[in-house]
Amino acid sequence: MKLNEIQDNPGSSKSRMRVGRGIGSGKGKTCGRGVKGQKARTGVAIKGFEGGQMPLHRRLPKRGFYNPFGLDYNEINLGRLQEAVDAGRIDVAAVVTNESLIASGLISKPRDGVKILGVGELKAKLSFQVAAASKSAVAAIEAAGGSIELLKRAPEAPTASAEA
């Protein structure tokens, strides 16, 4: 077999239908578009329609859900805290809180509190008052001689119920 002997498989390509060439052709007058309406006009494209093939937005599975009770923590690694201590942005003598981290520029918004994660090395002896911490972070903080206090979240205020 040579390159000049390659042929398409029989029936793999259909010849183009010439439309609008008289009613005897079977595709005259309205050219297979039916009568009037949006689909008979030019320039129309139905969003997401793939010619009858199952469209992409229906082929892909639905995933995940929104948890209305989920907490959104500011996560900070021990390595970033040590860099801030070395740069003098965190006072070693003071307790590290949500407010002090905002003041030092390590976090921008309060969100639902701060979670300390154990990536990196902490050499400074720091005491923390934060919402959450990983086990490795707690172990590293205590190994460096520091302390950590996990703050309890205040319960949500009850909404006014209709008593009528």
Swiss-Prot record:
Keyword Amino-acid biosynthesis in record: no
Composition-biased stretches (Polar residues): 1-14
InterPro entries, alphabetized: Ribosomal_uL15, Ribosomal_uL15/eL18, Ribosomal_uL15/eL18_sf, Ribosomal_uL15_bac-type, Ribosomal_uL15_CS
GO molecular function: rRNA binding; structural constituent of ribosome
Any single biological process term in GO: translation
Leader sequence segment: none
GO cellular component, one term: cytosolic large ribosomal subunit
Keyword Ribosomal protein recorded: yes
Key words, A-Z: Ribonucleoprotein, Ribosomal protein, RNA-binding, rRNA-binding
Compositionally skewed regions (Gly residues) per UniProt: 21-35
Domain of life: Bacteria
Region of interest called Disordered, as start-end residue ranges on this chain: 1-35
A Pfam family assignment: Ribosomal_L27A
PANTHER family membership: 50S RIBOSOMAL PROTEIN L15, LARGE RIBOSOMAL SUBUNIT PROTEIN UL15M
Subunit: Part of the 50S ribosomal subunit.
Function in brief: Binds to the 23S rRNA.
Similarity section: Belongs to the universal ribosomal protein uL15 family.
Official protein name in the record: Large ribosomal subunit protein uL15
Species, as recorded: Methylocella silvestris (strain DSM 15510 / CIP 108128 / LMG 27833 / NCIMB 13906 / BL2)
Lineage start: Bacteria, Pseudomonadati, Pseudomonadota, Alphaproteobacteria, Hyphomicrobiales
